[in-house]
Amino acid sequence: MLFSRSPFRLCRISAVGQTRQLPFSRPRFLSASVARYAIDMETVNTSERLARLRQLMQEHKVDVYIVPSEDSHQSEYIAPCDGRREFISGFSGSAGTAIVSMTKAALSTDGRYFNQASKQLDSNWLLLKRGVENVPTWQEWTTEQAEGGKVVGVDPSLITAPGARSLAETLRKNGSSLVGVQQNLVDLVWGEDRPAPPREKVRVHPDKFAGKSFQEKITDLRKELENKKTAGFVISMLDEIAWLFNLRGSDIPYNPVFFAYAIITPTTADLYIDEEKLTPEVTSHLGQDVVIKPYDSIFADATALSEARKQDAGEAAAKFLLSNKASWALSLSLGGEEHVEETRSPIADAKAVKNEAELAGMRACHIRDGAALIEYFAWLENELVSKKTSLDEVDAADKLEQIRSKHDLFAGLSFDTISSTGPNGAVIHYKPEKGSCAIIDPEAIYLCDSGAQYLDGTTDVTRTFHFGQPTELEKKAFTLVLKGMIAIDSAVFPKGTSGFALDVLARQFLWKEGLDYLHGTGHGIGSYLNVHEGPIGIGTRVQYTEVPIAPGNVISDEPGFYEDGKFGIRIEICLADVIMAREVQTTHKFGDKPWLGFEHVTMAPIGRNLIEPSLLSESELKWVNDYHAEIWEKTHHFFENDEFTRSWLQRETQPISK
């Protein structure tokens, strides 16, 4: 899955005009069946909402108002009650920033969502395509709208402290200013229609899956805080809190987290959470080691801690540590930039390096998940080809979930299944809806990006199949993507290498054809946590230069190719170390440093009729055949009493030759 996902409407199909050829050396036209499709996404009339928001902006003396995507914990994934940017703009993708002035409104998003946003935004909105030449960033557009000493407002809990300071400085140079508006203005527009905050119970995540007790994790964190000579750590990221305390929740769809804050000092551990979410089991689990405090008291307590620190030791007192992703509001409550040390979270770094129990769990859950995918694709092919069943994209996704749910330790999906036929696959974060989605066409490419939560790990896998006869052009595109995926999987690199440096390996074969994809190549994956997990990843984001790949990291490997209105191709395998990023033996050790590589754990066959063997090198062909042999070895026992699926698996894992 590609760096964030959020439910969105639609997938109505309508006719389109002529196809546009891909710039391959030997182009072919796409099949007529593929050319029939197009996405017709709903738009929301935002005129009334914008009018009400502008009225509130006048009342609060704000000329420009910023509406981020994130919640007060800077979550990539949010609960329905925090979907403010979607409500005000109508755009339902997971990433983007809305900016509203008294006369204009703009939505900035990245390349994953250009297609979707262009269809969902109504005529009130200007789409700012992030990263496109001569298109302003949302900060630049905001600064332009604020010229002449105007005031820009934002909810200070929804923007990071570094982001707020950077924007404030840019505005100051332009004669304008940034203010924090404590009452969220979009919430006022939303009114009683805004969904209620979740109130789900929290549950204990057993140590046998976590690999460490929460007491051990807090001890390790305190050692880190002592080394940094800080007064304590104020934690706001939800997955970090869940990981630290070995707890899981259900407050955000597909992500087993819960709304909470925490403060860890050398002698205390405070968890800020609504007490109604605690069960007797959770209370017993935390015992006397953790003090429970009301969720809403975090800001008052942070201010009190900051004041007490200054009174005890004055300005020379040790500062509190705060993640550089924490909110502006939380930073201000601790006294602001001069009184806190903002840094990459030490919990994020620790969480990204899985221990032996977590790595074992990731291996095991991916084998079970692979068995589910094998059963699903065998069933799907039989329904579409042999039985001629009419299945829509949602029917198929529901069947996959039902198959997964039969497996041990299943705890739900890790994101909305992207079940997409034909050109719907070109919408990178496509989400079908019953009643408006497409009927799966066996003569078109079918892309399925899906994942599950298991108590022993989190999965994320994409497979692209064609149940008919793919065109030469489709096979070439698929094989170029496959070559890039193999290049990452087979990479050997010195310790200290970043995901930024590895990214070119996945793109090189597409680049030679003048092609590319507008998303990252890989992201970190949590252990029964968020399917997107920092700080590691493989891609062109600058932050991927900050943290090198290390043994114990679990990372996805998912290059792709998409042609709007035609098809999408993506192949994804989860990588990790020691299993997944692991130390490898090399003939030489230049610089006397360790060398690393990857071990794949995803166990699902690659669509063999989409592979063009003549485009693969001998080593790449061997990789495919070895991988398929490994899948057979690790999964065929699941189908001892299912001869149909076993036969399908045997066919799909047979060696390929040129």
From Swiss-Prot:
Record's keyword terms, sorted: Aminopeptidase, Hydrolase, Manganese, Metal-binding, Metalloprotease, Protease
One cellular-component annotation, GO: cytoplasm
SUPFAM superfamilies: Creatinase/aminopeptidase, Creatinase/prolidase N-terminal domain
EC number: 3.4.11.9
Gene Ontology MF terms in the entry: metal ion binding; metalloaminopeptidase activity
Cited Pfam families: Creatinase_N, Creatinase_N_2, Peptidase_M24, Peptidase_M24_C
Superkingdom of origin: Eukaryota
Cofactor: Mn(2+)
Binding residues for Mn(2+) 2: 449, 460, 572
CDD domains: APP
Residues annotated as binding Mn(2+) 1: 460, 558, 572
Ranges in a coiled coil: none
Catalysed transformations (reactions): Release of any N-terminal amino acid, including proline, that is linked to proline, even from a dipeptide or tripeptide
GO biological process: proteolysis
Xref: PANTHER family: XAA-PRO AMINOPEPTIDASE 1 (PTHR43763:SF6)
Function: Catalyzes the removal of a penultimate prolyl residue from the N-termini of peptides.
Protein name (Swiss-Prot/TrEMBL): Probable Xaa-Pro aminopeptidase P
Lineage of producing organism: Eukaryota, Fungi, Dikarya, Ascomycota, Pezizomycotina
